Regions:
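Terminal, membrane-proximal amphipathic helices
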Residues: 1-109, 146-218
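Membrane-inserting effector segments that mediate pore formation, membrane fusion
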Residues: 108, 112-141
């Protein structure tokens, strides 16, 4: 199984690191163990949620972990992990929302991601590893985002619509009796109205431009 020792003064990975030797105090982690069987399972999940994505190599995961740790040493939070885990929260919310029917083409991948996140015992990186414990989760979400972005953006718009309806009716958002098809119908109506208004404005502009008096030279 690959064992990666992190020396942040050097670009190579297979170096022994201790605080005394390097003069660097790493954020509570000096090595990362990537078991071959767990990497194989991780790549199987990646293949199911993102069929076009090539399999990850251990060196790629180690390189990503090194970058996260370097940022942590500077007191910086990993934006990569933070943003992808927020997306993971959106996936959970969409799947758990009784008023939102997840599209059939994206539901399997979304459930696959949630299942991986919840099975910490078989995760590529243990969740309790300092700083990088959620890195594999974030990488999995990132790999699937090309196929899920549209669905999650639609769900976010549905939530905004539901909040607006709640404000209009004077009730709580979870009391709004609306579903995906209602939201879609309303948005289609809004789109048709917007297109109609654009055509009217364009017609009026063309009419006023053609009837405007020109200059007369005497």
């Amino acid at each position: 199984m690959p064992m990666y020792n992190f020396d942040f003064n050097r670009s190579v990975t297979n170096l022994n690191l201790s605080a005394a030797r390097s003069g660097i105090l790493t954020p509570a982690i000096t090595s990362l163990e990537l078991r071959e069987e767990k990497l194989r399972r991780f790549n199987e999940v990646v293949q199911r949620v993102a069929p076009d994505r090539p399999a990850f190599k251990a060196e790629q995961i180690a390189g990503a972990a090194r970058r996260v740790l370097r940022a942590a040493m500077k007191g910086q939070e990993s934006t990569f992990i933070k943003v992808r885990m927020r997306r993971a929260g959106e996936i959970r919310a969409a799947l758990g929302d009784a008023h939102w029917e997840v599209a059939a083409k994206t539901e399997p991948a979304m459930r696959e991601i949630v299942a991986y996140l919840d099975e910490s015992a078989s995760a590529l990186i243990d969740n309790d590893v300092p700083v990088v414990g959620l890195l594999d989760d974030a990488i999995l979400v990132d790999a699937a985002m090309d196929g899920l972005r549209g669905e999650l953006d639609d769900y976010a718009d549905f939530c905004r619509y539901r909040i607006g309806e709640a404000a209009r009716l004077g009730i709580l958002p979870n009391e709004v009796k609306t579903r995906r098809e209602c939201w879609f119908h309303e948005r289609q109506q809004e789109l048709r109205l917007e297109l109609q208004l654009r055509r009217v404005r364009a017609a009026n502009y063309g009419k006023s431009a053609s009837t405007a008096p020109g200059f007369r030279i005497c």
